[in-house]
C-alpha cells in the first residue's frame, strides 16, 4: 500500500523527511547544517521568541511508494544535494525565505556555529 512522504520545513529550509504507511513510519533528520541554517535565518528575521519561531514551520506532503525507508532516504539525499552550503547561506541571508530580501546579520549570529558540512 502506498505511503505518504512529508517534508518538514522552517520557512523554505527543509529539516526532516518522514514517510508513513498504515503500519510503519520512517524518518530522517537532515544534516545538522540545516538546523544551524534555520537558527541563523530565524535570528536574521528577528524570530527569536518561541511563538514567532514555531509559527514558521510547515509541512509538504505527497504520495510515495511502498518502500518508505527507501523513499525517505532518497528524498533526504535529494534535499541534502539541492541545499548545498551556498544555497543555505542565501537562505540565511534572506531570513529563510527563498528569493526574499537580505537581512543584516544579527549580533549573536556572528558568534554562532559555522555552517560546516
Please tell me what each predicted stretch does.
Residues 46-90:
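Helix-rich interaction surfaces within compact, conserved domain-sized segments
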Residues 17, 39, 84:
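Residue-level marker of positions within ordered structural domains that often coincide
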Residues 1-25:
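Short, charged/polar N-terminal "headpieces" of proteins
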Residues 27, 52, 56-64, 94-105, ...:
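Charge-rich, low-complexity amphipathic helices
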